[in-house]
C-alpha cells in the first residue's frame, strides 16, 4: 500500500500518519528525515544534497526523488509506505510518478484532509491564548500570523498537487475537521478497501 497524505498545516496529517503506521505496519517517509539520513549515510545522493544544503540552496526535485527512490528500496518499505510532506509541487508529483513507474510501482491513493481554514486559524489563536494564560511563551511558528503565512504558502504551492491527483483518479478527500477518531475510522475504511482480499 503506497499512499500520500495531503492537507494544510494543522490538518492532522502527523496524527493520522502515526495511526496508519501502527495499524498497517508500513513506514512513514518524511523527506526531511530521509535527507538527513542520506547525508549521514554518505550515499551519493546524500552527498549531493549535503553540498547543496551547505551552500544554502534548495535541494532540487531530482535529488529529493533520488533519496525517496533509495528509501523505498529498503526492506521495511516493500509492503508499502506513507509519504508525508512530499510531493509539494506538481513537478515533484510527476517526478515521483515517473520514478515509481520505472520501478514497476504506482501509488494506491492520495488522501487529502480537507479543513476549514478559518476554523484552523481559530484553533491556533485559542491555543496561543491558552499558552499565554498559563504564563508560557508562544512558539514563533504557533502564532496565528505565522500560521496564516504557512497556510498561504500551502494554498499557492501544494494545493495544485491535489488537482493533479484528482485528475489521475487517486485523490480521496476526507473531512479533516471531524473528531480525530472519526477521521481515523474514515482513513482505516478507505485503506482497508485498498488491500487485496486474501483467497
Curated annotation (Swiss-Prot):
Consists of three domains, a large central CORE domain and two small peripheral domains, NMPbind and LID, which undergo movements during catalysis. The LID domain closes over the site of phosphoryl transfer upon ATP binding. Assembling and dissambling the active center during each catalytic cycle provides an effective means to prevent ATP hydrolysis. GO terms for cellular component: cytoplasm. It catalyses: AMP + ATP = 2 ADP. Catalyzes the reversible transfer of the terminal phosphate group between ATP and AMP. Plays an important role in cellular energy homeostasis and in adenine nucleotide metabolism. ATP binds at residues 10-15, 127, 178. AMP binds at residues 31, 36, 57-59, 85-88, 92, 139, 150. It is found in: Cytoplasm. Residues 30-59 are annotated as: NMP. Gene3D superfamilies: P-loop containing nucleotide triphosphate hydrolases. Residues 126-142 are annotated as: LID. Its main location: cytoplasm. The keyword Transferase applies. Its EC number is 2.7.4.3. This is Adenylate kinase. The lineage of its organism: Bacteria, Pseudomonadati, Pseudomonadota, Alphaproteobacteria, Hyphomicrobiales. Belongs to the adenylate kinase family. InterPro entries: Adenyl_kin_sub, Adenylat/UMP-CMP_kin, Adenylat_kinase_CS, P-loop_NTPase.
Amino acid at each position: 500500500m503506497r499512499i500520500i497524505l495531503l492537507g494544510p498545516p494543522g490538518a492532522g496529517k502527523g496524527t493520522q500518519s502515526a495511526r496508519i503506521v501502527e495499524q498497517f505496519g508500513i513506514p512513514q517517509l518524511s523527506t526531511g528525515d530521509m535527507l538527513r539520513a542520506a547525508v549521514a549515510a554518505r550515499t551519493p545522493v546524500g552527498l549531493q544534497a549535503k553540498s547543496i544544503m551547505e551552500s544554502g540552496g534548495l535541494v532540487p526535485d531530482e535529488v529529493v526523488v533520488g533519496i525517496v527512490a533509495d528509501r523505498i528500496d529498503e526492506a521495511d518499505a516493500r509492503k508499502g509506505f506513507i509519504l508525508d510532506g512530499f510531493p509539494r509541487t506538481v513537478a515533484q508529483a510527476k517526478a515521483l510518478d515517473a520514478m515509481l513507474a520505472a520501478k514497476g510501482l504506482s501509488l494506491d491513493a492520495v488522501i487529502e484532509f480537507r479543513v476549514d481554514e478559518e476554523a484552523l486559524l481559530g484553533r491556533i489563536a485559542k491555543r496561543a491564548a491558552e499558552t499565554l494564560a498559563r504564563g508560557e511563551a508562544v512558539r514563533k511558528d504557533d502564532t496565528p500570523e505565522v500560521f496564516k503565512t504557512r497556510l498561504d504558502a500551502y494554498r499557492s504551492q501544494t494545493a495544485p498537487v491535489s488537482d493533479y491527483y484528482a485528475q489521475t483518479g487517486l485523490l480521496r478527500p476526507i473531512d479533516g475537521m471531524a473528531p480525530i477518531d472519526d477521521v481515523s475510522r474514515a482513513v482505516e475504511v478507505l485503506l482497508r478497501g485498498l488491500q487485496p482480499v486474501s483467497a
